[in-house]
Design a protein with these regions (language model features):
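Membrane-embedded, hydrophobic transmembrane alpha-helices
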Residues: 1-101
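Alpha-helical transmembrane segments at the extracellular/periplasmic loop-to-helix junctions
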Residues: 2-15, 106-117, 144-147, 307-308, ...
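Membrane-interface alpha helices of multi-pass inner-membrane proteins
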Residues: 53, 316-317, 352-366, 379
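Membrane-interface helix-loop-helix junctions at transmembrane boundaries of multi-pass membrane enzymes
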Residues: 88-102, 341-352, 385-391, 478-515, ...
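Active-site lumenal/periplasmic loops and adjacent helix-entry segments of GT-C-fold
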Residues: 104, 114-331, 368, 593-598
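Signature aromatic-anchored transmembrane alpha helix within multi-pass, membrane-resident enzymes
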Residues: 229, 386-402, 497-498, 554-580
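Perimembrane helix-loop-helix junctions
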Residues: 339, 343-350, 356, 360, ...
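Extracytoplasmic
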Residues: 556-733
Length: 733
């Protein structure tokens, strides 16, 4: 019946897409309505399914029934004017298919086809089962992050974790934005394999993001081509890391390290021609067999091409591994199209503002950084385009988001002992070497503003951002200064107006809102791990990408300006292109980054199936903290303490739990049972089962001194056993 249920779900999704796409009472192109409908159907429909599942449980009837209910709910507001809605769809199709729009239709079709092919190839390679039954990831970042997503997904689908408790930290409610994984759990409930359930929404939303960026560019006056280039930059844009391959090719040809530097070329101009020729000779071979990651991702600092690389290729740092940002970013793009169109429509358009508020209101369950970023961007746009509808967006957002926000605000925000307090103030983000990050307060914020101003005045700050993101920040700053100075008299004002004439005015307003996000993210860190502010910088980068795309399209027909701007755009994309080339088949196996990375062996898969079949769904397990622990990722069970790195980054207040977990895992040696603290701790944490794995050198293991032999001699009943791990029933302790 799996194919039947999945087909029914697909048909209901199409119905929901058409119904949701008919909600906005504003002038939209047909491709915009389809994309808006698809994103609203996924995001809001998933929340509706979750709310119903809280009452009725997660099963096939609930999944399909909630999808049908969502489609009906989307249709109710416009049903009485269905003739008008049908006419708008027909008019939209006629406009798209008209002869004078043929080029636009071809552009939309080619972009959609390219995006579908790209993301289908990448995401179907992200996770899968080989002929031997091993579950493998195709990328290291996917191996790491999707282990968490598998855990959350299967905690819903297999262990029926409703209302949701944190499967990585027993006894704590789930504060991680879980709706993306819950939506995948609904697909597992319908019969999809967990890997497919994670991959399918990823393909859909990734394609939607590419098309929505292009549609937004058209809406802002830049054109489809500018939008496609902006989407490419958002996916693969980076900094100057590509220069590292020039140095490697130079060294590979036999030149000295001194000769293979810019200063060396300047100091020995007579050798320049030979060095350049030798470098170019060896460059193709180095491109085909790259010895390191030139974006610095998962690379020790000593091997990174440039010092302090923190901006990695977005495709592999965010879009593939971090599923929540796909849901959040697609929702944000829909919000931008809705509010920009509604604010400039000359009509009340309150429904569109309300729909935007609904999407923002569910973001605390999906991607909290999107809510933060869009609050900043919308505040800037509201000042530029005054409209009463902004208040509707704000009120709806506040009402829908309030319950979840209250939970998050009241929850733990790390601890001083674990060095994971958040939010904190970090002027200039990660450009400096200082690790001091005071907790957010009025005093620290005031000091942080001063620190940021001082940072901006240093060459080190600009060197950091240019090395990491190339021309993106300088371009944004030039446009911002031009916008501020264009009304000034004299040469300064004239020069500013010439700069502004290169960009559509509406696009500049959106880019300035995105630049405001950059400023805030350069001051306040919103999670324990400061690198996670890249989830905010992604929205600044959208504005920078739109500016660069618009500039290229505007100037590319002019010879010298076109050549210059093409070179600038290429410099932003070169590092990402190198990273993508490294995935191709000709890369030597020792330098390959395309996996496989084993998430679970065939034996682990069997053990997980035994655990799921023979233990209560709400049982608590003592595990060794591996990110890819099969008891968590495949059986969906709850751990006393899962992977420490994730929990730390979420701002978990651990208390004594880490030390207690160590004590339990290491056993009591020859100590008498009456004096052994393990059994008291098992009772304290209400542990039902203990999983002991002899692969104590695996990545992420919390305590490598696990006493495998001690646990084997305690006489506990064995629930499941594999090649390396054993699960003991300790309820009779």
């Amino acid at each position: 019946m799996t194919s039947v249920w999945l087909t029914a779900a697909a048909l209901l999704f199409v119905a929901g897409t058409l119904a949701a796409g008919s909600l906005p009472r504003i002038e939209l192109r047909i491709e915009e309505r389809i994309l808006i409908g698809a994103v609203v159907s996924v995001l809001v429909g998933s929340v509706v399914t979750y709310l119903i599942a809280l009452v009725a449980g997660l099963n096939v009837a609930v999944v399909l029934g909630a999808s049908a209910l969502s489609a009906v709910a989307f249709a109710l507001p416009w049903w009485r004017r269905r003739a008008e809605v049908l006419a708008s769809w027909q008019a939209g199709w006629k406009e798209l298919a008209s002869p004078d729009r043929r080029g636009h239709l071809v552009g939309v079709g080619m972009t959609a086809l390219a995006a579908v092919v790209l993301f289908s190839v990448l995401l179907t390679h992200a996770l899968g089962t080989d002929a031997a039954g091993n579950l493998n990831a195709g990328f290291q970042t996917v191996w790491a992050d999707w282990s968490q997503h598998l855990t959350t997904t299967n905690s819903f689908a297999v262990a029926h974790n409703l209302p949701p408790q944190n499967p990585l930290f027993a006894g704590q409610d789930l504060r991680y934005p879980f709706i993306p994984d819950f939506q995948s759990a609904t697909l597992v409930t319908l019969g999809a394999a967990p890997a497919v359930a994670l991959e399918l929404p990823g393909v859909l939303l990734s394609v939607c993001i590419v098309l929505l960026i292009a549609a937004l560019a058209v809406r802002l006056g830049a054109g489809w081509g500018a939008g496609v280039l902006a989407a490419a930059i958002c996916l693969a844009g980076g900094g100057l890391g590509f220069t590292g391959i020039l140095a490697d090719a130079c060294l590979h040809h036999g030149f000295s390290a001194t000769q293979c530097t810019w200063s060396g070329l300047v100091a020995h101009p007579g050798d320049t021609l030979g060095i350049v020729a030798g470098t170019l000779h060896d460059l193709p071979g180095l491109v085909a067999a790259q010895p390191r990651a030139y974006d610095g991702l998962l690379t020790p600092p000593a091997l990174q091409p440039l010092p302090d690389q923190q901006w990695y290729t977005p495709l592999f740092a965010w879009w593939l591994p971090q599923r929540s940002i796909l849901y959040g970013f697609s929702g944000a793009l829909v919000v931008l199209i809705l509010v920009i169109t509604a604010a400039r429509s000359g009509r009340r358009a309150y429904q569109s503002f309300a729909l935007a508020g609904l999407l923002l209101g569910v973001m605390p369950l999906i991607h909290i950084h999107t809510l933060i970023a869009m609050a900043i961007v919308c505040a800037v746009l509201a000042a530029r385009w005054p409209h009463r509808g902004w208040w509707i967006t704000a009120v709806v957002t506040a009402i829908v988001a309030a319950p979840r926000l209250a939970t998050l605000i009241a929850g733990p925000h790390g601890s001083v002992a674990a060095f994971n307090v958040f939010p904190t103030v970090e002027p200039g983000w990660m450009y400096g070497s200082s690790v001091a990050r005071p907790a957010l307060s009025l005093g620290s914020l005031a000091g942080g503003v001063g620190g940021l101003v001082r940072a901006v005045l240093t060459p080190q700050y600009w060197g950091f951002w240019i090395a990491n993101t190339g021309v993106a920040l300088p371009l944004c700053v030039v446009v911002a200064l031009a916008a501020a100075l264009m009304c000034v008299r004299g040469r300064v004002g004239a020069a500013s107006r010439r700069v502004m004439s290169l960009f559509p005015r509406d696009l500049v307003q959106v880019a300035l809102g995105c630049l405001a996000v950059f400023a805030i993210a350069n001051l306040v860190v919103f999670q324990s791990w400061d690198w996670d502010n890249t989830k905010l910088f992604a929205y600044w980068y959208l504005g920078a990408a739109l500016l660069l795309g618009a500039l290229v399209v505007r100037l590319w027909r002019r010879w010298w300006p076109g050549l210059a701007v093409a070179a600038v755009a290429s410099s932003v994309l070169l590092t990402g292109v190198l990273v993508l080339v490294r995935l191709l088949p000709w890369t030597p196996i020792e330098n390959s980054v395309g996996g496989p990375y084993t998430s679970a062996t065939a034996s682990d898969v069997r053990v997980a199936a035994q655990v799921a079949a023979s233990t209560p769904s709400n049982a608590v397990f003592l595990t060794e903290g591996k990110p890819n622990d099969p008891v968590l990722t495949l059986a969906g069970r709850t751990a006393v303490m899962g992977y420490y790195g994730w929990l730390w980054s979420y701002g978990t207040d651990f208390g004594s739990r880490p030390q207690d977990v160590r004590t339990m895992l290491e056993g009591c040696g020859i100590q008498a049972r009456a004096d052994c603290p393990v059994f008291g701790l098992l009772r304290k944490y209400k542990v039902d089962y203990v999983e002991i794995d002899d692969r104590t050198a695996d990545p992420g293991i919390f305590d490598s001194r696990v006493d495998v032999r001690w646990w084997a001699t305690q006489g506990f009943a064995v629930v499941a056993r594999g090649d390396h791990l054993t699960v003991y029933d300790v309820r009779a302790r």
